[in-house]
């Protein structure tokens, strides 16, 4: 037996008492392998290749916010999805970044096995690195299927995490402006 993800999925199906050769499951191991490769493709991406040449000189010195960026990731504890939205903001210091790159940074880290707390920090630090901003704020609000489908089985809970760097951490007014603008 080879050592592919599909081979291991087939073994899991057998361990569950399923027949991996029945019609509905015959192609499941390969489909799952392909899905998992997509859901974890962030491991093969690096910040410079995601941002490319989309950081530009600018005199803009007011807050830039991109809110409601959809995200999904896999919980590293149970390999079950968590799904939510991410709000990012930065205070430029002579440079701005193409807005699609903010969403791509979110995806690069979300498409890995994650916990939401680390994901939030990784996104904030990457935006700070890419933009050299005066400060960065990131908030993620997500529902975790590992908590909804198993364990405590709480269907309506939503986890919120935030990371504030630079002026977003040091200046209450900057942080308050960010929080008020994402709630509009």
Curated annotation (Swiss-Prot):
It comes from the Bacteria. Keywords: GTP-binding, Hydrolase, Metal-binding, Nucleotide-binding, One-carbon metabolism, Zinc. Pfam families: GTP_cyclohydroI (PF01227). GO terms for biological process: one-carbon metabolic process; tetrahydrobiopterin biosynthetic process; tetrahydrofolate biosynthetic process. Zn(2+) binds at residues 75, 78, 146. The keyword Metal-binding applies. The keyword rRNA processing does not apply. GO terms for molecular function: GTP binding; GTP cyclohydrolase I activity; zinc ion binding. GO terms for cellular component: cytoplasm. It is an enzyme of class 3 (hydrolase). InterPro entries: GTP-CH-I_C/QueF, GTP-CH-I_N, GTP_CycHdrlase_I, GTP_CycHdrlase_I_CS, GTP_CycHdrlase_I_dom. It catalyses: GTP + H2O = 7,8-dihydroneopterin 3'-triphosphate + formate + H(+). Pathway: Cofactor biosynthesis; 7,8-dihydroneopterin triphosphate biosynthesis; 7,8-dihydroneopterin triphosphate from GTP: step 1/1. Its EC number is 3.5.4.16. Belongs to the GTP cyclohydrolase I family. Toroid-shaped homodecamer, composed of two pentamers of five dimers. HAMAP family: FolE. This is GTP cyclohydrolase 1.
């Amino acid at each position: 037996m080879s050592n592919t993800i599909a081979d291991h999925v087939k073994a899991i199906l057998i361990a569950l008492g399923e027949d991996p050769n029945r019609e509905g499951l015959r192609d499941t191991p390969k489909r799952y392998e392909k899905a998992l490769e997509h859901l974890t493709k962030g491991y093969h991406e690096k910040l410079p290749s995601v941002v490319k040449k989309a950081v530009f000189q600018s005199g803009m010195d007011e807050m830039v916010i991109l809110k409601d960026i959809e995200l999904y990731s896999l919980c590293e504890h149970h390999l079950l999805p968590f799904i939510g939205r991410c709000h990012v903001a930065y205070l430029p210091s002579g440079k701005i970044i193409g807005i699609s790159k903010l969403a791509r940074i979110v995806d690069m880290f979300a498409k890995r096995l994650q916990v939401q707390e680390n994901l939030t920090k990784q996104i904030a630090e990457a935006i700070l690195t890419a933009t050299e901003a005066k400060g960065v704020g990131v908030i993620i609000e997500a529902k975790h299927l590992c908590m909804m489908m198993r364990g405590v089985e709480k269907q309506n809970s939503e986890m919120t995490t935030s990371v504030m760097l630079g002026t977003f951490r040091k200046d209450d007014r900057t942080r308050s402006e960010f929080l008020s603008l994402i709630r509009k």
